[in-house]
Regions:
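N-terminal secretory signal peptides that target proteins for export/translocation
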Residues: 1-9
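Context-gated lysine
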Residues: 15, 24, 124, 150, ...
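Sec/Tat signal peptide C-region and signal peptidase I cleavage site
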Residues: 27-30
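Surface-exposed beta-loop interaction hotspot
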Residues: 133-181
Length: 265
């Protein structure tokens, strides 16, 4: 999840939910009726009903030098929403902001359309629901010198259904990837006013050697994230995300997450 590093606004990376610990309440479970987020672009995801945990090893590259900075843990599971709607619940835990960031997203399983999002960071907390083509929520930020948090109500018109930027890599893996595939997809980024269209394109199909999983055949997909263009390596056989890289152009650095959890099957 996706996974824009914390140096870029709120580190659009994260999501996994520990059963009951960070449960999203009844309101966000009001998923809208299934319909594709982008007409003509159908996503498909096979998700096990029980929790599934995937660990990525994160490295940072500056000036051609790599350094390991920790891990990103993604936990996903299927839950039932109102009316029996199947929803995908994802939580991500990773270091950032002088502590640990926990991002949780809830999406319609059939379309991956955003339903709700929560981000718990050392300096602030964000909670959003996506209903009726808008994002409604609260951002709570810590004041100077560890003073009390300040709550700000948020309403952002989105112009229709949208994907959560915290699940960029999952959305990419669920696309009908093939040679020359290209589409423009809308993602939610609160700091950029809500709806952010991003070009997504298959660059190539190739065999790539990964540090833990060895050589695999993958789709190499690019995503035009503003200020942090992403490249995502998706296993052609399992559709698992094997690697995600964000290039932070303004800081001449990149973040790379390599999967270390063995592939299923």
């Amino acid at each position: 999840m996706s996974v824009i590093p914390v140096v870029l606004h709120r580190c659009i990376v994260g999501i996994a939910l520990v059963a009951g610990a960070l449960a999203i309440g009844p309101a966000p479970l009001r998923a809208q009726q299934a319909a594709t987020v982008v007409p003509g672009v159908v996503v498909h995801m096979d998700a096990a009903p029980g929790p599934d945990t995937v660990v990525f090893r994160r490295s940072i590259t500056r000036g051609g030098v790599d350094s390991i900075t920790g891990t990103r843990t993604v936990v996903s599971r299927v839950v039932r929403g109102q009316g029996g709607t199947r929803l995908l619940e994802i939580e991500q835990r990773f270091p950032g902001g002088g502590g640990e960031i926990v991002d949780t997203a809830l999406a319609d399983l059939g379309t991956l359309r955003a339903v709700a999002h929560r981000s718990h960071q050392p300096a602030k907390t964000m909670r959003f629901e996506f209903v009726g083509g808008a994002a409604e929520g609260i951002v709570s930020a810590r004041g100077p010198a560890d003073s009390a948090r300040r709550d700000e109500a948020v309403h952002q018109d989105l112009g229709g259904p949208i994907f959560d930027s915290n699940v960029i890599e999952l959305v990419v893996a669920a696309l009908p990837l093939k040679a020359e595939f290209a589409a423009e997809l809308p993602f939610f980024i609160y700091e950029r006013g809500g709806r952010v269209p991003m070009p997504v394109a298959v660059r190539e199909r190739a065999r790539v050697a990964f540090p833990v999983l060895g050589e695999r055949e993958v789709w190499v997909v690019t995503v035009g994230v503003p200020g942090a263009p992403a490249t995502i390596w998706v296993d052609t056989a399992t559709r698992a995300v094997l690697r995600t890289r964000y290039d932070i152009t303004a800081r001449a650095m990149s973040f790379t997450d390599d999967r270390v959890t063995p592939l299923h099957g």
